[in-house]
Regions:
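A short, active-site helix/loop in glycosyltransferases that binds the activated sugar's phosphate group
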Residues: 130-155
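Short hydrophobic beta-strand element within catalytic cores of glycosyltransferases
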Residues: 282-285
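N-terminal strand-loop element at the rim of the active site
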Residues: 3-4, 8-66, 142-147, 225
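Conserved acidic donor-binding segment of nucleotide-sugar-dependent glycosyltransferases
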Residues: 297-308, 316-321
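A short, well-ordered alpha-helix in the C-terminal region of glycosyltransferases
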Residues: 323-338, 347
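Aromatic "clamp/platform" in nucleotide-sugar-dependent glycosyltransferases that forms part
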Residues: 246, 265
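Short His-centered aromatic/hydrophobic patch
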Residues: 83-90, 107-110
Length: 365
């Protein structure tokens, strides 16, 4: 039997999708699959896909003829092409036009837009969903959305990511000292600084807990177009919040926190939630998307956009060490029941085999 050849296509490369592709590439290569990763060069510099044994081809995140032609050339000879995200799937569908190569799309996250942009987003969702032979989604609500948008075959496929490396208690002490939270509670949030991640609501909540003694420090790791607006609010309102930008070793910073906070408008299998529960860090998150089915009873859930409920929950947990300890243990137990990387890779490989077999002979590429 000839070696299965796959191409993984990434667009902008969010942390979750990029980590997933890195994990997937390593696991597939270990199982004898030939893997090519197509992504913008900056994504490879951050995730080093060649270290997994995959071949890397730089393809810009554009839909102009040159970029589509480069992607089409990269997909020559592939048995299955797997696009990660809406934009990547739409561009890949263009690149595969006229070829009988099955396209798999993992719909990693839900996007939001208003007015004319909403119409454009709906069109993109329909094109991507209908172009794919199989749509994989990490949460039930995304499976439902894919079907609404016309997907021929949409399946629930929880995405497992590699567990973060931990430096232990010494590393946690160093992290707290670096952040200025040695003698005060440390709250940690991670994500791109864009509206749907809800950091404006988080700043509203910080106005409440700044009355505590000692005052908790909220640290937000990430970059994005809202940084200047958030920084301006932090300065003008004198909020106990620090924006630290994109950082290596965020897992170590998270492990040092007293609480992890996830205020998003929507999340699937949130990378922050997974890392927090695995590390035994109590999590306060919004009850949106795939979060409730991911965390079960092992986290405190609040409504999206309700700063008062978020602040009240944080204040209560900071004053209740026993409840934080219970949540930490419940988180570890919940995480132990999640699909492993091996489970995820085996499931994806079974989809590839299913799609590639009917086309194994007599196909013109």
């Amino acid at each position: 039997m000839s070696q299965l050849r796959t191409v993984q296509v990434l667009g902008g490369g969010s942390a979750g999708s990029s980590a997933h592709v890195g994990s997937l590439a390593a696991g597939l290569v270990a199982r004898g699959v030939q893997v090519t990763v197509c992504a913008p060069p900056a994504v490879d510099r951050a995730y080093d896909f060649t270290a997994t044994g995959a071949r890397f081809l730089p393809v810009p995140r554009r839909s102009d003829p040159a970029a589509v032609a480069a992607l089409r050339a990269a997909c020559t000879g592939a048995d299955v092409v797997h696009a990660h995200g809406l934009h990547a799937a739409a561009r890949t569908a263009l690149a595969l036009s006229g070829r009988a190569v099955p396209l798999v799309m993992t719909w990693h996250t839900r996007r939001y837009a208003e007015g004319a942009r909403r119409q454009i987003l709906n069109l993109l969702e329909r094109r991507a969903a209908r172009a794919a032979a199989v749509v994989l989604a990490p949460s039930s609500d995304l499976v439902d959305l894919a079907r609404e948008r016309g997907a021929r075959d949409a399946r629930l496929a929880p995405v497992a990511v590699p567990p973060p490396r931990s430096e232990g208690t010494d590393g946690e002490g160093k992290a707290r000292a670096e952040l200025g939270a040695v003698d005060r509670p440390l709250l940690m949030a991670v994500g791109s600084l864009v509206p749907h991640h809800g950091f404006d609501v988080l700043l509203d909540a910080a106005r409440v807990w700044r009355s505590l003694d000692p005052v908790p420090l909220l640290v937000i790791a990430g970059e994005g177009r809202d940084r200047n607006a958030l920084q301006r609010r932090i300065r003008d309102e004198q909020l106990p919040v620090t924006l630290i930008g994109c950082r290596d070793g965020v897992g170590e910073l998270l492990a040092a926190a007293d609480l992890a906070l996830l205020p998003s408008r929507w999340e699937g299998r949130s990378l922050l939630a997974q890392e927090a529960l695995r590390a035994g860090v109590p999590l306060v998150a919004t009850a949106v998307g795939g979060v409730p089915e991911l965390v079960g009873r092992a986290a405190e859930l609040v409504p999206y956009g309700n700063a008062e409920a978020l602040a009240r929950t944080v204040v209560r947990l900071l004053g209740d060490p026993a409840e934080r300890a219970r949540l930490a243990e419940a988180g570890r137990v919940q995480a132990a029941g999640w699909p492993t990387e091996d489970d995820t890779i085996a499931h994806v490989l079974s989809v590839y085999d299913e799609l590639a077999q009917p086309l194994a002979t007599g196909r013109v590429r």
